UniProtKB/Swiss-Prot annotation:
Protein name as annotated: Bifunctional protein FolD
Protein's UniProt keywords contain NADP: yes
Residue runs in coiled coils: none
EC assignment: 1.5.1.5, 3.5.4.9
Description of how the protein assembles with itself and partners: Homodimer.
Record organism: Syntrophus aciditrophicus (strain SB)
Length: 293
């Protein structure tokens, strides 16, 4: 029997409807959530992501600003822009679209953002709070994954969770989040990475398998336990469709795994819409905290 499809696009829409109401409530107090997205260069994927974020913010009634800089922009100028937005009362969330050009120290840029406006959750202050289960802003993709699990009624308490990938953006934070003794967590978590000798040994015992490997179809059906929940974080461009659009696939070999899993997220339409939605959740929360509401 084929797996249940967990459609992140549907769950994201539910959350966005709630956000619209909360934004209207804040507006009654004279507060409009404000988000600035800083884009360096003209990478097509980054430009597409930034456009999607801006459109979503506008639909929710947020104040949205895009600060586009050329690829040769200096690190010092970028730091000056961030310092300006740190002080701007209209801006509650600052997002720097990654990756940055090689001549810019990514860490230095992210660390310059006011932790109270760090809606990506990458500042060391917010990472530290995440580690002890007290984060104000959860990293957007891991937060989206957790909400997918909670809102799909998937039991994490006591579950064997295997995360494939140890990036600072997805793998490490989702592992830490699911370890916490909290709702939507309290799992036994294993993290696989490039140093793992036999990934399949671990993935085959996972009740919940979260894949963020950055490699197309890295997880095949023989690596998945019967009835497992599979969350595919990967987005890989593997060609072009007949109408000229990018052809995408995840890190999971979807069709064969779908026949074995109990539930699975598609690519696109799975984790992606949740990432943008959780960015909006964080921006609204930052606005509320800033106003003391």
């Amino acid at each position: 029997m084929a797996a249940i499809i967990i459609r992140g696009s549907d769950i994201a829409q539910e959350i966005r409807e709630d956000l619209k109401k909360e934004a209207a409530w804040l507006k009654a107090y004279g507060v409009v959530p404000g988000l600035v997205t800083i884009l360096v260069g003209q990478d097509p994927a980054s430009m597409s992501y930034v456009t999607a974020k801006q459109k979503t913010a506008c639909k929710l009634g947020f104040y949205s600003l895009q600060d586009s800089q050329p690829g040769h922009v200096s690190e010092s100028l970028l730091l000056d822009r961030i310092a300006r937005y740190n002080k701007d009362p209209r801006i509650h969330g600052i997002l720097v679209q990654l990756p940055l050009p090689p001549h810019i120290d990514e860490q230095k840029i992210l660390y310059a953002i006011d932790p109270g406006k760090d809606v990506d959750g990458f500042h060391p202050y917010n990472v530290g709070k995440l580690m002890i289960g007290q984060a104000d802003f959860l990293p957007c993709t891991p937060a989206g994954i957790q909400q997918l699990l909670i809102r799909s009624g998937i039991q994490t308490d006591g579950a064997e969770v295997v995360v494939v990938g140890r990036s600072n953006i997805v793998g490490k934070p989702i592992a830490n989040m699911l370890l916490q003794k909290q709702k939507g967590a309290n799992a036994t978590v294993t993290v696989c990475h490039t140093g793992t000798r036999d990934v399949g040994v671990h993935t085959r015992r996972a009740d919940i398998l979260i894949v963020a490997a950055g490699k197309p179809k890295a997880i095949t059906a023989d690596m998945v336990k019967e009835g497992a929940v599979v969350i595919d974080v990967g987005v890989n461009r593997v060609g072009v469709t007949s109408d000229g659009k990018a052809k995408l696939c995840g890190d999971v070999d979807f069709e064969p795994v779908r026949e074995k899993a109990g539930a699975i997220t598609p690519v696109p339409g799975g984790v992606g819409p949740m990432t943008i939605t959780m960015l909006m959740v964080n921006t609204l929360k930052a606005a509320r905290l800033s106003a003391g509401l």
